Amino acid sequence: MGMQGRSFARQIRAYVSLTKPRVVELLLLTTVPTMILAQRGVPNPLSVLSVLLGGAMSAGAAGAFNCYIDRDIDSKMSRTRNRPLVTGALSPKASLIFAWMLCVISVLWFLLFVNWLSALLSAIAVFLYAFFYSIVLKKRTPQNIVWGGLAGCMPVLIAWAAVTGSIDWPAIVLFAVVFLWTPPHYWPLSIHYSEDYRLTSIPMLGAIFPRKLVVLQVLLYAFAVVACTLLLIPVAHMTPLYGLFSAVLGAWFVYEIYRLYVRVVRGHEIKAMHIFSLSNTYLSLVFLSVGIDGVVSQLL
């Protein structure tokens, strides 16, 4: 590969990195199971593909806007100093244009290939993350990721709306599951990178509050998440199979966070990133259970 080819490949990698692909992957993980539950069976594959592509562009646009807005503070944090706007791989102007292009294309995509409600929800999701979280909340309140987490819940509503053309109670419960899951997911991260957040004056809970208090709140939110997953049983008429899965997964999730809390109370060293990673697994398995239940209920 010549110099031009390598340069082009680096540019592509930089633009992909700008979209925060790992976050996109996590958001899309909730999409297919939600569509299966809404359909009470396997939806049209083309419909699923359309929603996944639109969702990837929407989430990618939100990530790109966030990288543009946070480019100054990203340079001060070890976790983010390799992002393309910090390294100079992309210019701020090019990044902003790319973010707007993805945003507009994602909304038009949903409008043309899915429906108007998912297009509207997609636009709201980008606005919530790029403006409400990144500009209004992030530097102002320790509750930033709680309310900023609203954006991360939107793929569930988009997926449900794509199938039904409406927002129903099961979708709202799933929305609440992701909303309540967000603090137990991100606050352990803020504990691990507390020094980074202090250097940038971002008031993340894990950076400015005592660890004992932070982990206690993580534990309380974990109980709330589990309660919400169980609430789905009567609301969405889930089968006993889902009830068993959600109860076992919930007990495991709460137990692991309780173990972390005990270590903090006793003054021991903690590995907060263990809970960060574990929370990803927990949410993945909960939504996998939702998808399985949607297929099983069709067969009963």
UniProtKB/Swiss-Prot annotation:
Topological type in the membrane: Multi-pass membrane protein
InterPro entries, sorted: Protohaem_IX_farnesylTrfase, UbiA_prenyltransferase, UbiA_prenylTrfase_CS, UbiA_sf
Transmembrane segments: 21-43, 45-65, 94-114, 117-137, 145-167, 171-193, 213-233, 235-255, 272-292
A GO BP annotation: heme O biosynthetic process
PROSITE patterns: UBIA (PS00943)
Cell compartment(s), UniProt: Cell membrane
Chief place of localization: membrane
Molecular function, one GO term: protoheme IX farnesyltransferase activity
Metal-binding listed as a keyword: no
Gene Ontology CC terms, in alphabetical order: plasma membrane
Assigned keywords, A-Z: Cell membrane, Heme biosynthesis, Membrane, Transferase, Transmembrane, Transmembrane helix
Pathway annotation: Porphyrin-containing compound metabolism; heme O biosynthesis; heme O from protoheme: step 1/1
Top enzyme class: transferase
Annotated EC: 2.5.1.141
Function: Converts heme B (protoheme IX) to heme O by substitution of the vinyl group on carbon 2 of heme B porphyrin ring with a hydroxyethyl farnesyl side group.
Other notes: Carbon 2 of the heme B porphyrin ring is defined according to the Fischer nomenclature.
Listed PANTHER family: 4-HYDROXYBENZOATE SOLANESYLTRANSFERASE (PTHR43448:SF7), PROTOHEME IX FARNESYLTRANSFERASE, MITOCHONDRIAL (PTHR43448)
Annotated protein name in UniProt: Protoheme IX farnesyltransferase
Origin species: Tropheryma whipplei (strain Twist)
Higher taxonomy: Bacteria, Bacillati, Actinomycetota, Actinomycetes, Micrococcales
Gene: ctaB
